[in-house]
């Protein structure tokens, strides 16, 4: 009897999770389709994204992972989120000055968020940024992250090149 109950419970949990997982996968596909053109930085700039290097610097957390340079489209900071139209693009900064699109960041200004009902995307809730006034979610759709697709730091992203300003320092 216990075994049958356990099987039914697992099956019920699986069936309940399947739509969210499927929705998350279709949103990842939408994100990839909507941002593929931004591998060329000129397309990102033409679409309203701009570098945050002078304002925020490059993001890294030695021993945990990199986050790179963010290109922000301030016009998208409107409280809505769409998988194929992220508020920020995340680029790995290479020592030779080249930028490589590695991920996306979705941001909602904190004043537009009810903390008891945070924004969601990919079947996951956003979390508050520890310093900046935003609720955020990263999606490492262009560089696999062994820590998880939606973790903040990616150990597969290089740390900031020497001489580049680093956020928080």
Features from the language model and the residues they span:
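Sec/Tat signal peptide C-region and signal peptidase I cleavage site
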Residues: 18-22
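Positively charged n-region of N-terminal signal peptides that target proteins for export
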Residues: 1-4
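Bacterial N-terminal signal peptides
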Residues: 8-16
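Primary mode marks residue(s) on the alpha4-beta5-alpha5 output face of response regulator receiver
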Residues: 23-169
């Amino acid at each position: 009897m216990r075994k049958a109950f356990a099987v039914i419970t697992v099956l019920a949990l699986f069936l309940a999770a399947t739509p969210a997982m499927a929705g998350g996968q279709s949103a990842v596909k939408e994100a990839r389709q909507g941002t593929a053109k931004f591998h060329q930085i000129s397309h990102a700039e033409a679409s309203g994204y701009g570098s945050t290097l002078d304002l925020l610097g490059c993001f890294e957390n030695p021993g945990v992972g990199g986050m790179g340079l963010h290109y922000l489209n301030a016009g998208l900071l409107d409280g809505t989120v769409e998988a194929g139209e992220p508020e920020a693009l995340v680029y790995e900064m290479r020592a030779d000055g080249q930028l490589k699109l590695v991920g996306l960041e979705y941001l909602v200004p904190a004043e537009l968020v009810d903390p008891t009902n945070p924004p969601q995307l990919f079947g996951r809730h956003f979390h508050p940024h520890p310093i900046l006034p935003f609720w955020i979610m990263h999606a490492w759709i262009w560089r696999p992250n062994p820590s998880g697709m939606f973790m903040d730091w990616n150990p597969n992203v290089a740390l900031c090149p020497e001489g580049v300003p680093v956020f928080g320092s």
